[in-house]
């Protein structure tokens, strides 16, 4: 029953073979110097790919995003910067092969069109900043979205923000008050505006969203995937959650259809579903609208089922109802007979093909985390893929599932770094259910390895076989640590029942899984030093550090707690997306069922705390406000427990700025080395 698998061995061996004799440990600076792919746009003839390939300017503490082109017809071709697009962004191919992009003119982004081999032409003269755009395949319609007050057109909105008081006070009479890392501007929403293209310029304008009050795309993370424009430019489909007093407790995004010329109000196509409906995606033949839906209202981690709506009849069917995985991105194949999607499966996130007629799902790619999938005319796709070993590169898969690497943009830097080995394992977790985990070890290390026991956030999530520029498992192993992580009950990629099992059980089965998983890993691998471990986690993982401090206080030499919940009662009233904390505790507000929150409340067990803890938080974190971190630190200091507090005034729930990230790793490594010993790596001659 218990299985011990060495997966990703090919990738690990390849890295070892490429590593020079004088390899060195990876650093946080190395991580930030990696080139990062933007979403690729493929030319209609399939011969070229257009994308950003960003780099870090440490002196300016920011990333640059130059646009590159790759010749897909030439094996071994390397991405080349497009000189004509210097300073531009959001570049994409149109159906006619021309390149559309945004570029600043007198301090404000404008839309340009550049035919291949021709000169760019400015199409717009926007009087206000926009957030994004789409161009119809016919080229006769452009839609843009932008944060605007209630105003009928973009130009009016530029001068119609509400007059402000001479005082500095923000005034609200309903939530949201703040969202993610931003104080909400009352009356301002992300709205869609549509322009007819006349003589190569943007002409007649209309507001597509009509009198709807809500953000489209949704905030804080929605983008162009939530908006679709028909090929003929006549119809717009978009996801929107109607704003109101209950918005912070509602996950009810709906799909609306509206004429692009604003001639009639939007129509709600998914009014019957109180859960989330999003990612409207039109088939190439224009007959079918695909989208993903979650059935349960108030639950942001319900299964993503692909729905198909016949646009002529309105008939809708659940294509993947019988497939127990959640669809990520959704892309139509050119023949409209299948969909290419991404979905997590046991720590991997490959590309899958879904047959539209039967709903049959076939895996197309191997291990790693795929994204940015674009279907190709030969039945395959071009996509980005990363792994725990390396960041994104561009790949191609054909209709038979044969994968070809198209780029290797970080090869030179990766070749300098110490190799690592990655291994997945399964064990009997809580209730003897099958639970998965992984270990990552520096291949050159000898002797016993201290353990960095990393707990993922979400809690509905998975670190898995993927690259992160925040919690990077390969980097965490660099000083000579064995990184161990467990996909406890509640994790994603194992079926919906497993994901659901954490609801109302935050400190129950997950903690039991962590205990059993660490015991299994150390019993299976004698190189792991079971008596020398530190635990680390952020968000739910940070909550788990606070929970471990009181409920498993003798196991670890130190804890690293980032943006974790300390007091469930305060969290219930301080966080902004109320649907999350309410669903996780049985679907009720704190005042309706205090016992559900107090059952798993770390603050109730502070008297048992004794493990040294590093606490990290960001002042702009409105998801788990920084006051939760201050409270943890106060408890530690009041009890005389060795502790340290790091506060980033300019970061949110994530640490994103390069120098802040480097400081984060310096503090984390310093804390672990203090309690687990000095730099432990020992090199072979």
Residue ranges with predicted function:
Residues 55-59, 105-108, 149-152, 243-246, ...:
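Short glycine/acidic-enriched loop and turn motifs that connect beta-strands
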Residues 29-65:
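Beta-strand-rich domains and repeat architectures in extracellular enzymes and scaffolds
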Residues 400, 409-531, 538-539, 571-573, ...:
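Cap/lid segment of the alpha/beta-hydrolase catalytic domain
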Residues 64-65, 144-201, 206-209, 239-242, ...:
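Predominantly five- to eight-bladed beta-propeller fold
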Residues 485-685:
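Active-site-proximal cap/loop segments of hydrolase catalytic domains
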Residues 72-75, 115-118, 197-201, 259-263, ...:
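Short loop/turn segments that connect beta-strands within beta-propeller blades
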Residues 35-49, 83-102, 127-145, 179-185, ...:
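Conserved beta-propeller blade repeats
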Residues 64-66, 108-110, 189-191, 252-254, ...:
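A detector of repeated loop/turn-to-beta-strand junctions in beta-rich toroidal repeat architectures
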């Amino acid at each position: 029953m218990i299985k011990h698998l060495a997966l990703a061995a090919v990738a690990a061996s390849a890295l070892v073979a490429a590593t020079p004799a004088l390899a060195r440990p990876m650093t946080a600076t190395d991580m930030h110097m990696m080139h990062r792919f933007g979403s690729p746009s493929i030319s209609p003839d399939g011969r070229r790919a257009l994308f950003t390939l960003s780099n870090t300017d440490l002196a300016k503490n920011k990333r640059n995003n130059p646009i590159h082109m790759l010749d897909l017809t030439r094996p071994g071709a390397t991405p080349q910067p497009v000189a004509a697009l210097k300073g531009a962004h959001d570049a994409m191919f149109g159906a006619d092969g021309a390149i559309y992009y945004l570029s600043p003119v007198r301090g404000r982004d404008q839309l340009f069109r550049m035919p291949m081999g021709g000169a760019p032409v400015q199409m717009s003269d926007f009087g206000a900043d926009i957030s994004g755009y789409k161009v119809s395949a016919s080229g006769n319609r452009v839609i843009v979205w932008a944060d605007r007050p209630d105003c009928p057109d973009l130009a009016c909105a530029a001068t119609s923000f509400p007059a402000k008081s001479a005082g500095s006070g923000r005034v609200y009479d309903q939530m949201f008050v703040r969202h993610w890392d931003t104080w909400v501007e009352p009356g301002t929403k992300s709205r869609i505006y549509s322009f007819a293209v006349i003589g190569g310029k943007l002409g007649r304008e209309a507001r597509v969203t009509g009198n709807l009050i809500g953000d489209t795309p949704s905030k804080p993370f929605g983008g162009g995937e939530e908006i679709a424009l028909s090929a003929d430019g006549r119809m717009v489909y978009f996801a929107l959650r109607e704003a109101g007093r209950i918005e912070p407790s509602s996950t009810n995004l709906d799909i609306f259809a509206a004429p692009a010329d604003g001639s009639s109000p939007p129509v709600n196509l998914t009014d019957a579903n109180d859960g989330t409906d999003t990612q409207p995606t039109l088939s190439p033949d224009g007959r079918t609208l695909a989208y993903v839906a979650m059935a349960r209202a108030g639950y942001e981690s319900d299964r993503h089922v692909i729905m198909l709506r016949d646009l002529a009849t309105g008939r809708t069917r659940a294509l993947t109802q019988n497939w127990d995985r959640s669809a990520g991105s959704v892309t139509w194949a050119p023949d409209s007979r299948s969909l290419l999607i991404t979905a997590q499966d046991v720590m991997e996130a490959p590309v899958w093909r879904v047959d539209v007629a039967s709903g049959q799902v076939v895996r197309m790619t191997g291990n790693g985390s795929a994204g940015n999938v674009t279907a190709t005319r030969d039945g395959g796709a071009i996509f980005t893929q990363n792994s725990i070993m390396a960041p994104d590169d561009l790949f191609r898969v054909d209709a038979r599932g044969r994968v070809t690497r198209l780029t290797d943009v970080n090869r030179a830097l990766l070749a300098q770094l110490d190799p690592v080995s990655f291994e997945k394992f399964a064990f009997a977790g809580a209730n003897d259910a099958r639970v998965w985990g992984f270990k990552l070890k520096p291949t050159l290390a000898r002797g016993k390895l201290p353990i960095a026991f990393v707990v993922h956030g979400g809690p509905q999530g998975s670190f898995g076989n993927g690259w992160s520029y925040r919690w990077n498992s390969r980097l965490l192993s660099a000083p000579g640590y064995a990184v161990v992580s467990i996909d406890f009950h509640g994790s994603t990629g194992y079926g919906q029942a497993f994901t659901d099992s954490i609801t109302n059980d935050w400190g129950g089965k997950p903690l039991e899984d962590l205990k059993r998983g660490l015991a299994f890993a150390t019993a299976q691998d004698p190189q792991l030093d079971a008596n020398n471990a530190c635990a680390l986690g952020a968000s739910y993982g940070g909550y788990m550090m606070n929970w471990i401090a009181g409920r498993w206080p003798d196991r670890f030499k130190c804890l690293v707690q980032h943006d974790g919940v300390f007091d469930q009662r305060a969290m219930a009233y301080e966080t902004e997306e109320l649907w999350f904390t309410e669903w996780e505790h049985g679907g009720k507000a704190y005042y309706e069922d205090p016992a559900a929150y107090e059952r798993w409340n770390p603050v109730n067990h502070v008297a048992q705390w004794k493990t040294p803890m590093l606490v990290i938080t960001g002042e702009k974190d409105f998801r788990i406000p920084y006051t939760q971190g201050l409270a943890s630190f106060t408890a530690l200091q009041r009890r005389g427990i060795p502790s340290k507090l790091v506060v980033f005034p300019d970061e949110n729930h994530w640490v994103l700025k390069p120098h802040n990230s480097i400081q984060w790793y310096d503090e984390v490594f310093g804390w672990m080395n203090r309690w687990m010993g000095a730099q432990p790596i020992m090199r072979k001659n």
